[in-house]
């Protein structure tokens, strides 16, 4: 993710400093981006050069909360923190305690996809969401994510699957009356391997979801209004079906930025730099969401 942010910042011609921990990762970053990295970790950089006014935190998931906390302790006023912000509610609450008046946003970049923006426009035109469904099966077939630490694998629903859940509830509303079930287990994810649930959101929409990490499948979201069905499968694309027909048409999108950069990251980063992003997931919102994710995951 750090490379994705660097590509956007370079295109926006924004000055920035890159801070990393180890020589190997720093060398790989420099080789890929041409940008020098200050090694030694964020604490060392803060002591030597002082706090920045803004910070983007794109470290490994198990280091997110500690890194954000170190920045907030020195008075950084605004932080864009990679999703999910931490490995659970406890870590997010600790960030909240250290944030004070600082603004912390959780970087769920799918809120900024061109497909999502067009869906928001079309849904509003239709009069709002009546119901929605989403699939959170990991693909390909929930292969063990060996590239991350075991502690992250054990919380993979938060670290990875929460991306699609956030998108679904962002469009359809927050769950207020709902129930869920989970069962099974994987060797690397003991919490559960199968997930299902349904309920009602604060917008009045009904919803349901399902995921089976031991079966074929992939992420998808389907949003229903009184006149259309909007389908994200894959999430970067949008299809629409009208009432009275079972045919679906691909919606034309102005997705040049999503194709030139990591999808959603350009618009998300630009909105963060400008301030006051109405689409961002605030820290307080994520703390509430995390309780939902942990219940869904069976943690």
Please report, for each region that a protein language model flagged, where it lies by residue:
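C-terminal helix-rich "cap/oligomerization" subdomain common to oxidoreductases
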Residues: 18-19, 31-32, 51-59, 69-70, ...
């Amino acid at each position: 993710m750090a490379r994705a942010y660097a590509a956007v910042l370079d295109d926006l011609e924004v000055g920035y400093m890159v801070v990393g921990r180890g020589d190997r990762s720093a060398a790989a970053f420099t080789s890929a981006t041409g940008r020098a990295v200050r090694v030694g970790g964020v604490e060392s950089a803060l002591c030597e050069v002082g706090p920045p006014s803004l910070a983007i935190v794109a470290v490994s998931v198990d280091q997110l909360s500690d890194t954000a906390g170190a920045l907030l302790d020195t008075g950084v006023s605004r932080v864009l923190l990679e999703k999910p912000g931490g490995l659970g509610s406890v870590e997010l609450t600790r960030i909240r305690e250290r944030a004070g008046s600082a603004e912390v946003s959780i970087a769920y970049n799918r809120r900024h996809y061109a497909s999502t923006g067009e869906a928001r426009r079309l849904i509003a035109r239709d009069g709002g969401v009546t119901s929605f469904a989403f699939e959170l099966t990991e693909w390909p077939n929930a292969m063990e994510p060996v590239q991350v630490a075991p502690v992250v694998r054990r919380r993979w629903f938060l670290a990875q699957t929460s991306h699609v859940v956030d998108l679904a509830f962002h469009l359809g509303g927050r769950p207020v009356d709902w129930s869920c079930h989970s069962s099974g287990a994987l060797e690397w994810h003991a919490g559960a391997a199968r997930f299902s649930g349904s309920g009602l959101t604060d917008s009045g929409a009904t919803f349901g979801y399902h995921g089976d990490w031991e079966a074929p499948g992939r992420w998808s979201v389907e949003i229903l209004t009184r006149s259309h069905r909007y389908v994200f499968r894959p999430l970067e694309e949008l299809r629409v079906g009208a009432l009275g027909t079972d045919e679906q048409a691909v919606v034309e999108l102005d997705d040049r930025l999503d194709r030139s950069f990591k999808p959603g990251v350009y618009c998300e980063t630009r909105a963060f730099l400008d301030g006051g992003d109405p689409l961002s997931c605030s820290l307080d919102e994520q703390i509430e969401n995390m309780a939902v994710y942990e219940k869904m995951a069976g943690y």
